């Protein structure tokens, strides 16, 4: 045991340093703690959702649990395990992106599970937890090593987060580097999944319907959103993937009375190049526009 003591102390020191870095989770956890009794809306999804909704521009108290690489499995665990802390929760907003149903769920050892266990006491490991499950650095050493370097040494890529944990200075990115030049952007490659995954689709759609059933059984209004994408992304989509996704969503809407669809994926009129960080993520300016529009929709 004495042999391991210095190692444990070292990891604790590193994790303490990690916790000093501004992160959205810290602010979200604090907001959940202080405003849980009054939160009426909660958002769930991937980085696209994280970027798109800034609760500052919603009329009701809200929290956005969207996070990079987050799939519906983790979304559902978060909802189930925090619901009792939100006695006035009325609306849940779930992202279903273009290829959400084609991508396998994250494993029970997904590194973000440590994040949610650490900050929100949400156990998504599907097992008994241990001390190490709260240690952020060892959950993803490459990610946190870069974060430590950026914060303590190079002083770059430091996020500024509002009370709700939204990154308000998220304006840089691919399009910024290209100076929002649409001709240059059009010549760039696009990160997009075009491969259909029949097995994942079958599992994911059944699992997602379980989420919808849960919201219905718990008297929650559910809004499914497809988020704005830039034109270069839209033209690269696999039509079969889009059709399958949209067919499932329409079927669910017709089946469950508590469900509404807010589809803005193809809205190229309201959103232009200046609203995007890259072809599939809004920047903080685009998020303000989108959240205000969503607010109007939710108010009707």
Describe each PLM feature range:
Residues 40-42, 91, 221-223:
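Structural motif
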Residues 212-238:
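Active-site segments of SGNH/GDSL-like serine hydrolases
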Residues 1-18:
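Hydrophobic membrane-insertion alpha-helices, especially the h-region
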